[in-house]
Amino acid sequence: MIDAFFIAGTDTDVGKTVASKAILQALGAKGLNTIGYKPVAAGSDKTAEGWRNSDALHLQKAATLDIAYDDVNPYALELPTSPHIAAKHEHVEIKYEVLSEKLAHHKEQSDIVLVEGAGGWRVPVSDTDSLSTWVQQEQLPVVLVVGIKLGCLSHALLTAEIIKADGLNLVGWVANRVNPGTEHYAEIIDMLEDRLDAPKLGEIPYIPSAKRKDLGKFINVEPLLNA
């Protein structure tokens, strides 16, 4: 069984956190000790405890192990924009070694760590680096979240292609229905099943306020446990 994996999205706002929560809930139902890890988050609110990102908070709550927020999300950036822009404006340097130290600690504590990305695969974290470079360094297996909408086929196939070109293992994908009005849904799923060289872990239907719901029933985590 893998001890950590990375959640990538075909774009921003495709439901990475929804899928991450669903996977964490499904893993927890198997009796596994889990940690949700959001290394970099852009778009945070000031609280009495410090800056907090809502997606990172959902991961913190969905995991079975209770760890400090700063360990879930070491870089909570205020501005809701590309991480490299937010970091520059906030005079923050995102350091790979910090991300790696946290990940190593999480692996020691848990059975499996879910690492959620930010934006799409090549999202920059500085003027020269992307989060995907760190994922390559860590050699994390990848689960791809596909937001089912017009244009998702090209985005999904291109993202899967570059993940493999980067030398990483695509261990599964999740279909998340972000637009209930998307036509030809079944045909889109059929094409993804045919063209993506990885098992489908599940389909999450369109659900209002999905991040607040029990979603584990939509996910089959056996391919992850056998990877």
Curated annotation (Swiss-Prot):
It is found in: Cytoplasm. InterPro entries: DTB_synth_BioD (IPR004472), P-loop_NTPase (IPR027417). ATP binds at residues 13-18, 55, 116-119, 176-177, 205-207. GO terms for cellular component: cytosol. GO terms for biological process: biotin biosynthetic process. The active site is at 38. It catalyses: (7R,8S)-7,8-diammoniononanoate + CO2 + ATP = (4R,5S)-dethiobiotin + ADP + phosphate + 3 H(+). HAMAP family: BioD. PANTHER family: DETHIOBIOTIN SYNTHETASE. Catalyzes a mechanistically unusual reaction, the ATP-dependent insertion of CO2 between the N7 and N8 nitrogen atoms of 7,8-diaminopelargonic acid (DAPA, also called 7,8-diammoniononanoate) to form a ureido ring. This is ATP-dependent dethiobiotin synthetase BioD. It comes from Vibrio campbellii (strain ATCC BAA-1116).
